């Protein structure tokens, strides 16, 4: 099971520069809100699609595969999913 505490730490240290508070400082409409993830993420709103995006990047977002390990990617994906699913952003 993914570690949400690890995911939050990874998010805060690596993702928050562009995605603080679930937003997007580069492309404002492409937030980490559930509706935006459903609309813009290849594969829709699910853990696998979030993992794919983190690993491979897209557009202005860099690929994190090789920069974060498997547990870190799983954790941050679970954290993003949990925050968005619960409208916690």
Curated annotation (Swiss-Prot):
It is found in: Plastid, Chloroplast thylakoid lumen. SUPFAM superfamilies: Cytochrome c. GO terms for molecular function: electron transfer activity; heme binding; iron ion binding. The keyword Transcription regulation does not apply. Its main location: plastid. Heme c binds at residues 15, 18-19, 61. PROSITE patterns: CYTC (PS51007). GO terms for cellular component: chloroplast thylakoid lumen. Functions as an electron carrier between membrane-bound cytochrome b6-f and photosystem I in oxygenic photosynthesis. Monomer. This is Cytochrome c6. The gene is petJ.
């Amino acid at each position: 099971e993914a570690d949400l505490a690890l995911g939050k730490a990874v998010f805060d240290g690596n993702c928050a520069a562009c995605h603080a508070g679930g937003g997007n400082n580069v492309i404002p409409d492409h937030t980490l809100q559930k509706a935006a993830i459903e609309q813009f993420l290849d594969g829709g709103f699910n853990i696998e699609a979030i993992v794919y995006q983190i690993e491979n990047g897209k557009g202005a977002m860099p690929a994190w595969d090789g920069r974060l390990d498997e547990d870190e990617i799983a954790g941050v994906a679970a954290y993003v999913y949990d925050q968005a699913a619960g409208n916690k952003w």
